[in-house]
Amino acid sequence: MYLSRLPPRSIPCRSINQISRVVARSSKSRLEFVGSYQNSLTTNQTRCLRPFSSTSRSQLRDYFPEADHEHIKKTEAAWPHPNYPKEQMLTNISYAHRTPKDFSDRIALYLVRFLRFSTDLATGYKHDPVTITENGEKVLKKPYRMSERKWLIRMVFLESVAGVPGMVAGMLRHLHSLRRLKRDNGWIETLLEEAYNERMHLLTFLKMAKPGWFMKFMIIGAQGVFFNSMFLSYLISPRTCHRFVAYLEEEAVLTYSTAIQDIEAGLLPKWTSPEFRIPDLAVQYWKIPEGNRTMRDLLLYIRADEAKHREVNHTLGNLDQNEDPNPFVSEYRDKAAPHPSKGIEHIRPTGWERNEII
């Protein structure tokens, strides 16, 4: 490329002075920026404990900061969370599977297994179980693949679609009640509360991880497919949909149980660090007492919620979809006998049979 040479040109002294002042100001601002940037990095390293993010550490911020209003001090949850004693979460909650009894149950189970395979593939989930040797030592057969970051990726993706079934079912039952000019017998509130609870799980994890554009794209696609599939399926067979959600919650209980075992085995050091703090959102929603605010405690609460959803949907799948009342908000004649409730003191992992409660 040919460049023409221009004759040399003298620069006035006044221009030289102006240029010198500009350079001095820019150098000073640059030094101030570097200093503030280093301070922000140091602050984020000590204060920001978000293990997974698609952005650089210096760009991390509160994913949905609380707005400061002139007249409103605080907005409480629409559905206050019931109290879960820690002893009950440890003794009453565990993985359980309901054996399919008819063709509808088998269809629901096969769909859940396919969805589980697809989700594992999408989130990169691959867990190597811990084996116990004769000496009682815990040994991994293969190099461990799950980390805090991978667990959060999986949890964010799962909870982003877990709130869909309850909202779809509640919406359709609401419209069904309007068309029939009849009461719904309490189903709508429980289904909407379930969707709300799943959304609180998502918001809690978003306080620890900010998804990138690829995760957001996956969530949009999964939500679009899942919502429309649930919408059409619930119109055809509500009972099959409730069984499907119950089997899905069985997998959720298994997932969180595995994560809790990993924490207890010391495989997730960032979550067992004394500096780690769970989000204040979780403390306020679950009313977590002081001294029980570790990541393990948080996952115990979330696992208990998933176990409750498992019980609710297995039970609703056993009832008459049009006539039976919601047993989880009903008042029983014999209050001393075990019966469905919002708590976990009498939780039934595979659901209550119709002849036990109606």
UniProtKB/Swiss-Prot annotation:
Task: Write one Gene Ontology MF term.
Answer: alternative oxidase activity
InterPro entries named in the record: AOX, AOX_sf
**Would I find Transit peptide among this entry's keywords?**
yes
List this protein's GO terms for biological process: alternative respiration
Q: Which residues cross the membrane?
A: 152-172, 217-237
Highest taxon in the source lineage:
Eukaryota
Q: Name one GO cellular component term.
A: mitochondrial inner membrane
**Which Enzyme Commission numbers does its entry carry?**
1.-.-.-
Bilayer topology reads:
Multi-pass membrane protein
- Give its localization: Mitochondrion inner membrane
Q: How is the cofactor bound?
A: Binds 2 iron ions per subunit.
Entry binding sites for Fe cation: E159, E198, H201, E250, E306, H309
What is its biological role? Answer: Catalyzes cyanide-resistant oxygen consumption. May increase respiration when the cytochrome respiratory pathway is restricted, or in response to low temperatures.
* This protein's name: Alternative oxidase, mitochondrial
Taxonomic lineage is: Eukaryota, Fungi, Dikarya, Ascomycota, Pezizomycotina
